[in-house]
Regions:
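Extended, histidine- and acidic-residue-enriched regions that form the cofactor-binding/catalytic faces
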Residues: 1-98, 102-195
């Protein structure tokens, strides 16, 4: 089905927003982007809602000036998102935007949660905002390059993980990543598909 027909049936667009940030020596640059792009693909397939190309740059903490990383300021990301959403709202008739991100930085989330539109609604789905309960050993799942990121990447993109550099103290595995991914996907589908 063409994008135009899908938008007529349900004028909703998934917009994955990642970051180009280093998550330690064992994970690839753009780890957050890989996670949200895979989730956006699977959510789109499950719901029939088209997804926009990923926005690969976001706001990241100034304490992470590692090689290869590149960030936008909060105001810049906010402006870029407002302009893109205005374009999709006016040009394609989109009336609901589902922003999907996996970056726990407060400024990043603020930029995405304060988007303004003429008529459309904007929903922000933050992977790290989910309650993982006892699914993680690490009490702080939002740590870049930690148990959550590493397990997810070991599941969805194992070729991009430097297995020999994964910290031994991390309770990360591909099996855990698969279970976490299924949990995340189901929670997001519940939010996305609720009437």
């Amino acid at each position: 089905m063409a994008v135009r027909d899908r938008l007529r049936a349900r004028p909703t667009l998934l917009v994955p927003v990642g970051t180009t940030e280093q998550h330690g020596p064992h994970l690839p640059l753009g780890c957050d982007s890989l996670i949200v792009e895979r989730l956006a693909d699977d959510l789109s397939a499950a719901s029939g809602i088209p997804r926009a190309p990923a926005i690969e740059y976001g706001v990241q903490p100034p304490t992470h000036p590692l090689p290869g990383g590149a960030a936008l300021r909060r105001k810049t990301l906010h402006r870029v998102m407002n302009e893109l959403i205005e374009s999709w709202e006016e040009g394609a008739g989109v009336r609901e935007f589902v922003i999907l991100t996996a970056q726990a930085n407060d400024a990043h989330l603020e930029a995405l949660s304060t988007i303004r539109t003429a008529e459309a609604s904007v929903v922000l789905l933050d992977v790290f905002g989910l309650d993982f309960g006892d699914r993680l050993v690490t009490p702080r799942p939002k740590v870049a390059g930690g148990e959550l990121d590493t397990s997810l990447l070991l599941h969805i993109a194992p070729a991009f993980v430097a297995h020999d550099l994964v910290p031994l103290e991390l309770a990360a595995s591909s099996t855990k990543g698969e279970a976490l991914y299924r949990f995340i996907l189901e929670r997001l589908k519940e939010r996305l598909l609720r009437p």
